Regions:
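A conserved structural motif in NAD(P)-dependent oxidoreductases
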Residues: 205-216, 227
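Substrate-binding pocket helix/loop in short-chain dehydrogenase/reductase
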Residues: 96-97, 104-109, 191, 201
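Short, small/polar-rich loop/turn modules that mediate ligand/substrate recognition or access, typified
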Residues: 86, 172, 177, 231-233
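Alpha-helical segment proximal to the catalytic Tyr-Lys
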Residues: 125, 169-170, 229
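Short C-terminal tail/terminal secondary-structure segment
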Residues: 145, 221, 232-248
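Conserved glycine-rich cofactor-binding loop
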Residues: 14-18
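Active-site helix of classical SDR
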Residues: 120, 156, 164
Length: 248
């Protein structure tokens, strides 16, 4: 299916590995010129080879103040303008109510909420002026069904989801859509650190498999497509049936 985005430009945060890399590969395969960021130069170089084509790589630590804004500004300068923004960042360490302290909540907010808001504020105004834009935030199934052992992550990303919903309504008339892709258990380096055995990780998923980052990337690319112009303010669960709730 032609997604209608060939020739567009995109910035994908934390695009050097995992779900961000899956999104970058999918967008590039559809003819989008991409810029990615990450903290490790070697991983960025390897990701650029995996993505193929003319990839802009930028070093950035999204836990640092203003890093989200700076990434978007640098990506825009390199690409000329920005049509598509995929926000993404590594998740906080596991923790429950009992062992998650206030500093952990602050760190999670800075990484998984504030940096995303910075990126949106730096990119959406120009999208509105041009009359076309796509924002897709990679969040978590935890915003629909909170994960007890990922307390800080679930709290921070739930706050981001409210921001996305409100922003989507505000900018919809200007041709800009704002959505989120909400992954369940995908086999990434982060998941492997929490649950080292792949079969054990899959056992909590009704589909009894773990998600593939490349499949996830294809879903993100669709949300960023021309065909998805009537989809905004929503969260797409990509979770193998993990979330059991009825309501969005």
């Amino acid at each position: 299916m032609d997604l209608g985005i060939s020739g567009r430009t995109a910035a994908i945060a934390a695009g050097s590995a995992g779900l961000g890399l899956g999104a970058a590969k999918a967008l590039a395969a559809d003819g989008v010129r991409v810029a990615i960021c990450g903290r490790d130069a070697a991983k960025l170089a390897a990701a650029a080879l995996a993505i193929g084509g003319d990839v802009v790589t930028l070093e950035a630590d999204l836990s640092a103040p203003n890093s989200g804004r700076e990434f978007v500004e640098n990506a825009t300068a390199a690409l000329g303008h920005l049509d598509i923004l995929v926000t993404n960042a590594g998740g906080p360490p596991p923790g429950t109510f009992e062992n998650t302290d206030l500093d952990a909540y602050q760190a999670a907010f800075d990484m998984n909420c504030r940096s995303m808001i910075e990126m949106c504020r730096a990119s959406i105004p120009a999208m509105r002026e041009r009359g076309w834009g796509r924002v897709c935030a990679i969040t978590s199934v935890g915003v629909k069904q909170p994960i007890g052992y990922l307390m800080a992550s679930s709290v921070a990303r739930a706050g981001l989801t409210s921001f996305l919903k409100i922003t989507a309504r505000e900018v919809a008339a200007d041709g800009v859509t704002v959505n989120s892709a909400q992954p369940g258990t995908h086999w990434t380096d982060r998941v492997a650190k929490i649950v080292p055995d792949k079969e054990t990780a899959a056992s909590s998923v009704p589909a009894r498999i773990t998600g593939d980052p490349d499949d996830f990337g294809a879903a993100v690319a669709f949300l960023c497509s021309e065909q998805a112009k009537f989809i905004t303010g929503t969260g797409l669960l990509i979770d193998g049936g993990q979330a059991a709730g009825l309501l969005d």
